[in-house]
């Protein structure tokens, strides 16, 4: 596959932080400003522009919209609602950007209730956003977000409040996960807290088309379940523990994949195995798929994988690769510190005496 000139141009001084497949011809990237002449200033990237870029690989055309501020941490998903193509992106502070493909980007969208975003997923006909303290929001329409979180008496353990991911087979069969083995199921009416056989930090969640629910951890731990039966496939003791961090996870053609930052791994016989067909280059941090194709994004590479071979959509072979790895690690550490601070504030809030 030849590289798209417009995409190369749009990514000058930008790095990819999120990828999304809308359909077989439409991919979306979130890209953060990265000044090649002054890479050391990347640590202040939240002050600078970011882009949501839509790519049509059939027509080789590129559309984009610009955020006024950067997206040091971004979340994106897209697909079709009522037959119309749509993409939603957000940063940690619920600064949403909607791309609806009829008139380009709708610009910023602010919900009536402010909340911190940890994950976005299009399930059925609605976007869902995960916030801290087990707060789940459903987007009913533009600017209209409805909270559908568990009510207080449903909380078997109210202290495990950091929530990280959501996914679902349908809008009446959804799961969410968070810290210390905090795992929940939603039947369209109420949330039920589950009791998995582990208590590590759950950061990724996939409801796969084989009927399985996969829950992953940052150190490559893995929990798998179906019909209420859960198996800790890869325990904390058996995880990599080699300095790798899992950044993203997807299920593609009957196989589970994770992006660790330096390589892509697939699950085979209850072990993570490097996918040699996907060449590593610096960082590979974001991954998404549908039934036909998988897209992997990194700081200097975007590639499409069909299960057998990769085709590079974008590549940057600049001398800044090593610097990007370092700043990526710094950004990841900063995100962890920010999350820990949010959790501490949540805990303090819960401890305050009621008036």
Regions found by a protein language model. Give the residues of each.
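Beta-strand-rich domains and repeat architectures in extracellular enzymes and scaffolds
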Residues: 5-48, 69-77
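Surface loop/turn motifs at the tips and blade-to-blade linkers of beta-strand repeat domains
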Residues: 8-11, 65-71, 109-113, 150-158, ...
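Conserved beta-propeller blade signature
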Residues: 28, 85-88, 127-129, 174-175, ...
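Loop/turn residues immediately N-terminal
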Residues: 33-36, 50-51, 91-96, 133-136, ...
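Short loop/turn segments that connect beta-strands within beta-propeller blades
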Residues: 58, 100-104, 140-143, 186-190, ...
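Solenoidal tandem-repeat scaffolds enriched in leucines and small polar residues
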Residues: 136-225
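Surface-exposed loop and turn segments in beta-propeller and other repeat-based domains
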Residues: 148-159, 236-240, 317-351
């Amino acid at each position: 596959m030849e590289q798209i000139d417009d995409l190369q141009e749009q990514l000058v001084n930008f790095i990819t932080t999120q990828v999304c497949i809308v359909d077989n011809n439409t991919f979306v990237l979130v890209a953060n400003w990265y000044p090649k002449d002054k890479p050391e200033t990347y640590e202040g990237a939240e002050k600078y522009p970011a882009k949501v870029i839509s790519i049509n690989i059939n027509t080789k055309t590129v559309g984009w919209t610009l955020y006024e501020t950067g997206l040091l941490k971004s979340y994106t998903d897209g697909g079709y609602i009522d037959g119309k193509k749509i993409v939603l992106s957000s940063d940690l502070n619920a600064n949403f950007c909607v791309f609806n493909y009829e008139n380009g980007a709708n610009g910023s969208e602010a919900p009536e209730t402010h909340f911190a975003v940890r994950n976005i997923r299009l399930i059925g006909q609605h976007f869902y956003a995960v916030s801290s303290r087990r707060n789940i929001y459903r987007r009913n329409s533009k600017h209209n977000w409805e909270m559908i979180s568990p009510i207080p008496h449903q909380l078997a353990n109210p202290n495990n409040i950091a929530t990280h991911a959501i996914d679902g087979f349908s809008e009446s069969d959804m799961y969410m996960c968070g810290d210390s083995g905090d795992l929940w199921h939603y039947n369209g009416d109420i949330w039920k807290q589950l009791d998995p056989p582990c208590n590590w930090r759950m950061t990724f969640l996939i409801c796969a088309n084989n009927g399985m629910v996969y829950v992953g951890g940052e150190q490559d731990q893995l929990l798998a379940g179906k019909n209420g039966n859960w198996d800790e496939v890869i325990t904390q003791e058996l995880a990599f523990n080699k300095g790798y961090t899992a950044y993203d996870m997807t299920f593609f053609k009957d196989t589970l994949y994770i992006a660790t930052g330096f390589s892509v791994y697939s699950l085979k016989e209850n072990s993570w195995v490097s996918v040699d067909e996907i060449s590593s280059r610096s960082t590979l941090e974001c991954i998404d798929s549908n039934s036909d194709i998988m897209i992997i994004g990194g700081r200097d590479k975007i590639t499409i994988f069909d299960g057998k071979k990769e085709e590079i959509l974008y590549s940057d072979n600049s001398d800044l690769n090593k610097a990007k790895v370092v700043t990526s690690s710094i950004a990841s550490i900063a995100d962890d510190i920010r999350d820990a601070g949010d959790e501490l504030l949540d805990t303090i809030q819960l401890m305050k005496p009621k008036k």
